[in-house]
Structure formats: C-alpha cells, structure tokens
C-alpha cells in the first residue's frame, strides 16, 4: 500500500518512516508531491492543505490521516464525495501543546525574548529596566476557552503554580465572563464556522495576556494588533496565525509584546513517535478491512 507522509521531516524521521514502508515527501517539494499523487493510497497530512484539487489528482486515495487533531486544512466534503476516509489523532500531541502553552505564558510574563535580545546585544542593564512589566503566574486567573485534552492537562499545571483556573466550553461556563475577567486567556478550540474570529481581544480584561496554540483563525487578528499596540493587552503568546506561513513583514512581528513560534506547539519527538504508531495502526486496519481509529468522515 502506497503511504505518503507529507511533512518537512528530519533525516531521522525519514529513516524511521522508511523502515515502516512509508515515503516522506516534504511539504516544500510541490513537484515531487504532484508526481506521487496518482499512486497515493494513504496520505498522512500535517498542515499543507488537502484541497479538492489534491483529492481529484489522487484516484487511488483511500485514507487521509491527519497527524494531529484539527481537520480544518482538509476539504472533508470533497473526500466524503469520493468515499475517502478522513481520520485524526486526538491526544497524541496534547502534552506537548499543554507544555508549550505554559511556556508561552511564562515567556510573556517575563518578557523572555526581549531579555535574550538584550543579553546578546550587551545591553544587560537595559533588560533590568523592564522590571515593572515582569510578572508571576501565581495569583493570576487563567481562562481556558475549550476544555478538551490539552486544557485538562494544562489546568493542573497552572494550579500547581498558584493560578486560579476558569474555563468555558460548549457545555459549561460563560464565554463573556471567562474572556472578560481572566488575567490570561488561552485558546483550545477547533476552527470551524462557529468559532472563526470568535475571540475579540478588545473584550478581554485590560492588561491581560492572550495565548493561542490552537488555530490562528479563532482570533480577530486586526483587533489583536490594535489591542497590543494601544496597551489594552499586555502581551500575546502566539504559535498559530490566520495566515501560515506568516509573512516576515506582518505587523504583529514588529511588536515587542508578542512572543511567537511557527506552529510547533505539537511538535516533539514523543508526539511524532506516538503519531506514527497510531497512523500505522490505521494503515493496518485499512488493509484488513477493520474499522478505523478516530474516523471523522
């Protein structure tokens, strides 16, 4: 069975999946990917959109396996029309994302990127001048929007550090209260028609911090930029953006109170190992005609 992992992986990862009979094709290799499409039966997908055009060019495709949980980068309707199964892997990256969320919170509170820049530029004492904006997590109220696997791991970490946790989900809590009364707000929601631009930073508590390791489209990015520039928000820790890859001249990147990462909260060696194992199990099940794990379409 022709299985292709569409991802810019390391040499070690390439060797690992080759040993399993899986071909690794870099997301940046558009020509190579197009050449593989006619023969692909199983596509392991990370972030490069699986469009209707991609699906149409893959006549043998039987399974699109999301490496991760969010399937907003897959044209699920096009796959469904072709009878192609779509599966995800909930939980394989939860600990990695929870830890990265905590890291971004602390980096915002301690202005970590600016401190590193000051030390490297031999401006040691200049960094001390930021002291009035340094803060601790203990004693703060942290609002979690969404309460799935990631926030359930994150909440006890925050409480162990002295934070008070409140949350909103589709079944519990009040959205406006959590958004408007939290000292820090962390996003843990899927991106869909109901959640797109759900979060307006202007409705957050003045001086609060926004952390997003879910999807960039959850936030009104223009409003976020305004809130960070005028001081309504103290800082933002962002692993995801409305447009990815992000332009180097994006105005958010020019702000000193933005801590950013290139959508890697999920990406650890442990996450990849768990994901490859689970994805291989679905390959086995597909070949054996057994029910697939975590099928969403």
Pin down the residues of each PLM region.
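N-terminal glycine-/charge-rich "phosphate-binding" loop or analogous flexible N-terminal tail
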Residues: 1-42, 287, 295
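N-terminal Rossmann-fold NAD(P) dinucleotide-binding loop
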Residues: 151-152
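Short beta->alpha connector loops at strand-helix junctions that form conserved
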Residues: 28, 67-68, 84-95, 169, ...
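Glycine-rich Rossmann-fold phosphate-binding loop(s) that bind the pyrophosphate
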Residues: 147-148
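Rossmann-like dinucleotide-binding domain for NAD(H)/NADP(H)
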Residues: 159, 209-297
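Phosphate-binding beta-alpha-beta segment of Rossmann-like dinucleotide-binding domains, i.e.
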Residues: 82-84, 90-141, 156
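Short, well-ordered coil/turn residues at beta-beta hairpins
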Residues: 6, 46, 67, 186-190, ...
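Rossmann-like adenosine-cofactor binding region
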Residues: 52-55, 164, 170-251
């Amino acid at each position: 069975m022709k299985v292709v992992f569409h991802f810019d992986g390391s040499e070690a990862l390439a060797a690992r999946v080759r040993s399993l009979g899986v071909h690794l094709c870099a997301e940046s290799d558009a020509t190579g990917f197009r050449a593989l499409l006619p023969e692909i039966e199983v596509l392991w997908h990370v972030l490069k959109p699986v469009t209707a055009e991609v699906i149409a060019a893959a006549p043998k495709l039987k399974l699109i396996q999301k490496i991760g949980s969010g399937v907003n980068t897959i044209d699920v309707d096009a796959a469904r029309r072709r009878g192609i199964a779509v599966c995800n892997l909930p939980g394989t990256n939860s600990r990695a994302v929870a830890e990265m969320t905590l890291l971004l919170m602390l980096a915002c509170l301690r202005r970590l990127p600016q401190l590193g820049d000051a030390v490297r530029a031999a401006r040691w004492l200049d960094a001390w001048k930021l002291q009035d904006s340094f803060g601790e997590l203990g004693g703060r109220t942290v609002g979690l929007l969404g309460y799935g696997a990631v926030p359930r791991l994150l909440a006890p970490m925050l409480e162990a550090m002295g934070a008070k946790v409140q949350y909103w989900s589709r079944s519990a809590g009040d959205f406006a209260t959590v958004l408007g009364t939290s000292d820090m707000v962390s996003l843990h929601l899927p991106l869909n028609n109901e959640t797109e631009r759900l979060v307006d930073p202007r409705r957050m508590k003045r001086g609060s911090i926004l952390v997003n390791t879910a999807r960039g489209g959850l936030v009104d990015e223009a409003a976020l930029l305004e809130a960070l520039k005028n001081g309504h928000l103290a800082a933002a820790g962002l692993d995801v953006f409305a447009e990815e890859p992000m332009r180097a001249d994006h105005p958010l990147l020019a702000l000193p109170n933005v801590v950013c990462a290139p959508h890697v909260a999920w990406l650890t060696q442990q996450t990849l190992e768990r994901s490859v194992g689970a994805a291989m199990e679905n390959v086995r099940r597909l070949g054996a005609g057994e029910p697939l794990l975590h099928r969403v379409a």
